[in-house]
A protein has these predicted regions:
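Juxtamembrane intracellular "pre-TM" segments in multi-pass secondary transporters
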Residues: 7-19, 202-233, 426
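Residue-level signature of mid-helix packing/kink "hotspots" within the transmembrane helices
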Residues: 41, 69-77, 160-161, 274-282, ...
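Paired small-residue
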Residues: 102, 112-120, 319-327
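Cytoplasmic helix-loop-helix junction between adjacent transmembrane helices
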Residues: 117-155
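Symmetry-related core transmembrane helices of the 12-TM Major Facilitator Superfamily/SLC fold
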Residues: 178-196, 392-410
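Conserved MFS/SLC helix-loop-helix module at the cytosolic interface between two early adjacent transmembrane helices
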Residues: 74-112, 288, 295
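Extracytoplasmic
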Residues: 24-58, 246-252, 369-373
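Extracytoplasmic gate region of multi-pass secondary transporters
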Residues: 43-45, 226-284, 366-374
Length: 426
């Protein structure tokens, strides 16, 4: 008996060691996700500095920043397939290294370097959340997986808030734009090395090796042949855009230049939206599961976003802009619910690809809306006769996006348990 026990214990110890290694790798990938969101949101607190850095206008800066979403959306499709084909060790650290190199390139005061750097940032960032979910699924028991993914999402949102609320005061105290981007680039590259060292090698299935990389793209045919997938992407994209573009690119400039807030107050107010995400994402997800329905939570949250946007722009009630932006951020957490719906309206064997598919659709829509907002409204920030009316026009643009999200939501299939036949039959 002792001989068999001795033979089995090394295998068990090896399994436990590998599980711990996956948890450690997940931890570093969560840091990756935090830093990725900080990189995404921090340009909003340095628009004027970036204009001087690249010797271009605010519209030119918006164009440079917007190219991030071109590569982020397209690489979202590649990231999931790369994880399945190559494993985490040979894909996620590479994505993080690309993000770090993109930050270093962004520090070069040349528009072309800024464009390429931002493209690299978007491409590398696409591996963060997907990689964290992949590693969490291998490091945590099934009963803790949802908690691990929820914690990952919250940390990412904190990164978005830190990119404004922490970086803003640093810039205000005189930190040079060049120094910031070199510094964060080096930090990201160091964490990428630690991630590579900590991530264990995996035994990939023979079906993956035989099928080749192209076979991993076939599930996307299933996802993109389902009209509900597009509806999920449109709804999530319309709810994400007011935060990713309206707040994380134009928020600080709008409050500072249109409403004449101090730089410090503008940064604090803008940072309330990603801080609201930290609470809104898990809260609204829990509420959706609790009532067993998806659509009412999406529609109700979009309506709250519209009311909060109207309050911020027209202030009919004695509610501060800071609180209004926080409420807006909490409600925008409903943008994550279509990520659950797209998995529920597609077959079980393509759920991973469904996540990549909705990421692609969401940020492709973001990439389309960004230039529209920049040309129609953003370019006039601080440069029009009636600044208050200009701010209100910007708010109405995002309120219209939320209204359109509500309309499209009515065409979504209700996938909550309360709508299932067994839930209503007795």
């Amino acid at each position: 008996m002792s001989a068999s026990q001795a033979a089995s214990s090394p295998t068990q110890a090896q399994t436990q060691a590998q599980t711990r290694a996956f948890v450690i790798a997940w931890f570093f990938t969560v840091i990756f996700y935090f830093l990725e969101y900080a990189v995404r949101s921090s340009p909003s607190v340095m628009i004027s500095g970036l204009e001087d850095h690249f010797s271009t206008s605010a519209l030119g800066i918006a164009t440079i920043l917007g190219v991030y979403y071109y590569t982020y959306s397209s690489m979202s499709l590649v990231a999931g397939a790369a994880l399945d084909h190559l494993g985490a060790k040979r894909s996620v650290p590479v994505g993080m290294a690309i993000l770090g190199l993109g930050c270093l390139l962004f520090s070069v005061p040349v528009v072309l370097a800024g464009d390429i750097g931002r493209l690299c940032q978007g491409a590398g960032s696409a591996f963060a959340f997907t990689g964290a979910v992949y590693l969490a699924a291998r490091g945590f028991p099934a009963r803790y997986l949802a908690t691990a993914i929820g914690a990952t999402q919250c940390v990412g949102m904190l990164g978005g808030s830190a990119g404004q609320n922490v970086v803003g005061p640093m810039i205000e105290r005189g930190l040079a734009i060049h120094t910031f981007w070199v510094g964060i680039g080096i930090i990201i590259l160091v964490v990428a090395v630690l991630l590579y060292i900590s991530t264990p090698k995996e035994q990939l299935g023979t079906h993956i090796q035989e099928g080749g990389f192209s076979s991993l793209l076939k599930p996307y045919e299933v996802v993109f042949s389902n009209p509900q997938s597009y509806l999920c992407g449109i709804v999530a994209g319309l709810l994400f855009a007011p935060t990713t573009i309206g707040d994380m690119i134009w928020g600080v400039a709008a409050f500072q230049k249109d409403l004449q807030f101090s730089y410090h107050n503008a940064v604090v107010i803008a940072s309330m939206v990603p801080l609201g995400w930290v609470f809104g994402c898990p809260l609204l997800g829990w509420l959706s599961d609790r009532i067993g329905r998806r659509k009412p939570v999406i529609i109700g949250s979009a309506a709250v976003m519209m009311l909060a946007g109207a309050q911020i722009a027209f202030h009919p009630l004695p509610i501060s802009a800071r609180l209004g932006m926080f409420i807006f951020g909490v409600a925008s957490g409903a943008a994550m619910i279509p990520y659950s719906i797209i998995k529920e309206v597609n077959p079980d064997n393509v759920k991973g690809s469904a996540t990549g598919g909705i990421n692609f659709l969401v940020f492709a829509l973001t990439a389309l809306l960004g230039p529209v907002y920049a040309h129609r409204i953003g370019r006039g920030t601080g440069n029009v006769p009636n600044l208050a009316v200009h701010f209100q026009r910007g708010a109405m643009f995002w309120i219209a996006c939320c209204a359109l999200a509500i309309v499209v939501s009515f065409f979504l299939r209700e996938t909550g348990r309360a709508a299932q036949p067994q839930a209503v039959s007795k």
